[in-house]
Amino acid sequence: MLASLQSEQGLVYLNASSWLDEQQAAKALTRDQLRERVLGQGERIFIDFSGITDKAEPEQARKAMEQLAGISFDADWVLVSAYKGELLFTPLGPPDDPAFYQVMERIDTLAGQGKRHKRSLTQTATAEAGLPRGAFYLKLNRKISVAECTFPRSRTWDRGDRLFCDSPNISLVYRVNLERSLQFGNTGSATPDAKIVRISLDDESAGGGIQLNEDLTWSENIADYLLLDGWARDYATDAIAQDYRFTIDASNTKAAVLKSLPTNLNSKYEHRRISGFEVGVTGGVEVNKDGPKASWRRRPSSASSVTMPTTPRIIGSNARPECPEGEFQLGAGSIRDGGVTALLQDRHRLGNGVRCGSQPHPAAELQGLRAESGCHLQGGADETGSTEFKIDSSVNIRPIYTGIYKHYYVVGGHVSFQGFEDVDKRRRVTASTSFKVDWNHPVFTGGRPVNLQLGGFDNRCLSAGAEHGLSAVTCDETSAAQSFIYDQYGRYVSALDTRRCLDGNNLGQLQSCRLSLGQRWEWKADSDALSNLSAHQLLGHNKQTGELALYDENGNPADVSVRTLTSYTRILRATAGN
């Protein structure tokens, strides 16, 4: 795969086995470095899992990827590139996977990427109080084989088979958002207390979609025997999509369908609708002087609603009204003057003669799939572990068969043109991909990550290490180990492991999160002092060793400082909307 490239083309190779070595893992990419290299510098990261052979090691490596990106894939290779100012993940299959070459050949100007990336890293005051989210794109590419689009040349006679497609393919980009909704209200418009995974089909990908044919061509078959009454001719027109189907399945019961879009799609359906689902909060704090010292609070929001255009030119009359299992289906490709089915089933009297040389129906205007549709899934507020989401994208390929029947009355006659609905002359082709979501990812806490800087040093911050031990290390705003979420209970939850909290009863090691007062903290007004609600003492540290302890506000030894500072870190993005 790599050897086939004419040049490196900005491709960076990353062996996933390096994540298994503790020393190499410490030097690995951070989340922000990944974004900077891909979005800022225009690099493409090729992550290679194929060299990992031990049964336990692949899962360990994928856990490391979840720490890096929030998701992982059951694939030997994953290509990370830029798309619309976000990361695009492309799981790769065999060495000749066309998706690899498609991504490598796509030209994104570095200047355009840098401009989008600069906006993503430089947040406004409103955005800094916005909803933390993990957003990424997932690319799916599959060629439709010759065999899958080969059908009988004639419906009436045995004239062999032919290919009914021209360069057919399934090329889709899915957008995935990971968010947290905190409950606000308990009646009517109340928002859920839940972890949210939003999967939607992107409709702006250049050249993307499900494509069978650019234009429709047809072939004619003529009866090779003397005929008074019967089929005189039939026509076989290139294939169209009878319907498109997208199914999202979860590997366990941790995720339930919250909303599927579209919920209805009729042939005359022309309406832009807003998703009826809202995320329960817009941000961690009000934009005020408290900044990162303010804990996460619930408040209402309507900023995260999703507008779904539901009028692609592929609408038909057979769409499913509801999608309780995370499945939605779009109808047949439309013809200029109405639906395909209605057109072909309409019988046209053509008089006593047979028109030769052309089919007696209008030319078709075809367009590949460009629908923006999706599914919103929710996990419980206390959900842990992980869920693998499998996305099946399929097209029901349908050749168009029509025919001319000669009617004989002894005295005179006529011919009729007829279209056919042969279900057995259709074939569904599916492309699948999957990704795994870690429900313990810090984005699902709903809070903005912050650090705790020790004021007795020039540049030391609190960091979680092996076995959840705490130490003072050089500050790094892109480090997950140095990031904490100051949650609605006043706890400092580790972004490295959201099941662990800073505990005043054991400051040498992070403890399992509870609602005990020993894990609840508040900032003294107009000061850099962090007070423990159980001991009513301040968080302090030894100015030589960095060892943490609780101290009284006054009368402390000279080698102790109770000065603690905090600021936002950059391991998650925060936005005011979508």
From Swiss-Prot:
One Pfam family cited in the UniProt record for this chain: Leukocidin
InterPro entries: Hemolysin_N, Hemolysin_N_sf, Leukocidin/Hemolysin_toxin, Ricin_B-like_lectins, Ricin_B_lectin
Positions of the UniProt region annotated as Disordered: 289-322
Record keywords: Cytolysis, Hemolysis, Lectin, Signal, Toxin, Virulence
An MF annotation (GO) of this entry: toxin activity
Gene Ontology terms describing biological process: cytolysis in another organism
Similarity comment: Belongs to the HlyA hemolysin family.
Name of the featured protein: Hemolysin 4
UniProt source species: Aeromonas salmonicida
